[in-house]
A protein has these predicted regions:
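Short His-centered aromatic/hydrophobic patch
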Residues: 97-103, 121
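A conserved mid-protein helix/loop that constitutes part of the nucleotide-sugar donor-binding site
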Residues: 16-21, 194, 198-217, 228, ...
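Glycosyltransferase donor-sugar binding loop
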Residues: 36-42, 168, 199, 227-241
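Aromatic "clamp/platform" in nucleotide-sugar-dependent glycosyltransferases that forms part
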Residues: 260, 279
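Short hydrophobic beta-strand element within catalytic cores of glycosyltransferases
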Residues: 296-299, 309
Length: 374
């Protein structure tokens, strides 16, 4: 059985790491995974470093790059024959899409070639009635969380959709002190500081400006030696706005913009506290990575965060955009180390039980095999 994973290639995020976890599991089965990229960039560099082969197919305009319906339709039609030919020539059985642009571009060429199309939805879908047409484009839908599952179009029958949690390598953990020394050396972090960390894309809806404001307010009232590291990349305009905010609030000596890092779990293991300030996360992959690495979590309440974190049991949640509640929850970590260790241990146990790569792969492969039978 040949399973094709097409990707744009312009970024590396949670969906890519989830598929790489699945890839490792599939390699030991009778399934042949094949990667296709449409851009040479961050993802191709990562695959090269892992010695994973991929095909490159140039696509000038992917469907969904523009929100205008006529342009989406034009891109689907324009790219149809090239992709349909590739699927037929390589005798692909299943196309597994993990990105909106990929799903819109590849789904019809796949279905009309006779291949099975699996639409892996990793973001909350809007309430637009146009999404009801997605049932014509895909054979099956997988959602990564309850909030994503509940946002799927109501006309998708239950027999054609499933909630499957993202996979993680729960066995791979780092020694905290070694990780901290490594991060200190790379980014010149003060050795004795309490290190708060954010890791993810630098985009507006991630609410990083709120985190910076909270950090600045706390440091002005506290004698603790705190440092904030922001790991990730975004467009220049937003990133520069964040840098200006840091300078405006007078905390530029206590905030490090680290850029992209290929080993997020190792970075997370160096944090004394990981902060996730968005309330709109469809899942929250970095939260689970922190749970595995025994790093305590402070996250905004809402979205996938509320599904992953049991407040006060496996992490702490604060009310979205409420600075006072943020500070209050942070103080609970700082002032009660014994209870913090209990939360860390609870979180680690939960992560290992719920998010193993093995159980994820079993669920996905079950869908693959069922597609061949039907």
């Amino acid at each position: 059985m040949k399973v094709l994973f097409p990707f744009v290639g312009d970024s590396v995020g949670g969906s890519h790491r989830s598929i790489l976890e699945l890839y490792d599991a599939l390699n030991s089965s009778a399934i042949t995974p094949i990667f296709v990229l449409h851009e040479i960039g961050p993802l191709s560099s990562l695959l090269d470093s892992l010695n994973i082969q991929y095909e490159y197919i140039f696509i000038k305009n992917l469907a969904g790059e523009s929100p205008y319906i006529p342009k989406i339709i034009f891109s689907i039609v324009f790219n149809f024959f090239k992709l349909n030919k590739f699927i037929r020539k390589n005798k692909i059985d299943i196309v597994h899409g993990n990105d909106l642009r990929i799903n819109l571009t590849w789904s019809l060429p796949a279905r009309l070639s006779g291949a099975f199309y699996l639409w892996h939805q990793r973001a909350v879908m809007s309430s637009s009635v146009l999404w009801k047409t997605s049932t014509l484009m895909a054979d099956y839908f997988v959602a990564i969380s309850e909030c994503v599952y509940n946002s799927l179009p109501s006309n998708i029958p239950k027999s054609k959709k499933k909630l499957i949690l993202n996979p993680f390598d729960t066995r791979k953990t780092y020694e905290i002190k070694d990780s901290r020394r490594w991060v200190n050396s790379i980014y010149s972090i003060p050795k004795n500081s309490i290190l708060l960390g954010y890791i993810g894309r630098l985009v507006d809806w991630k609410n990083i400006d709120f985190l910076i404001s909270c950090f600045a307010k706390y440091t002005k009232k506290s004698s603790l030696h705190l440092h904030l590291i922001i790991v990730g990349v975004g467009n220049d305009k937003y990133t520069n706005n964040l840098r200006r905010l840091v300078c405006k609030l007078g905390v530029n000596s206590m905030v490090t913009f680290a850029g992209f890092n290929y080993d997020p779990s190792r970075v997370i293991s160096a944090f004394d506290l990981m902060v996730a300030p968005s309330d709109k996360e469809p899942f929250g992959r970095t939260l689970v990575e922190a749970m595995i690495q025994n790093t305590p979590i402070l996250a905004a309440k809402g979205g996938g965060h509320s599904e992953i974190i049991d407040n006060g049991v496996s992490g702490r949640l604060y009310e979205h955009n409420n600075i006072d509640d943020f500070i209050s929850q942070f103080n609970l970590y700082i002032n009660n180390s014994k209870y913090t260790h209990k939360i860390i241990n609870n979180a680690n146990t939960i992560a290992k039980l719920k998010y193993s790569s093995h159980s994820h792969a079993e669920s996905i492969v079950c869908i693959y095999r069922q597609s061949i039978i039907t």
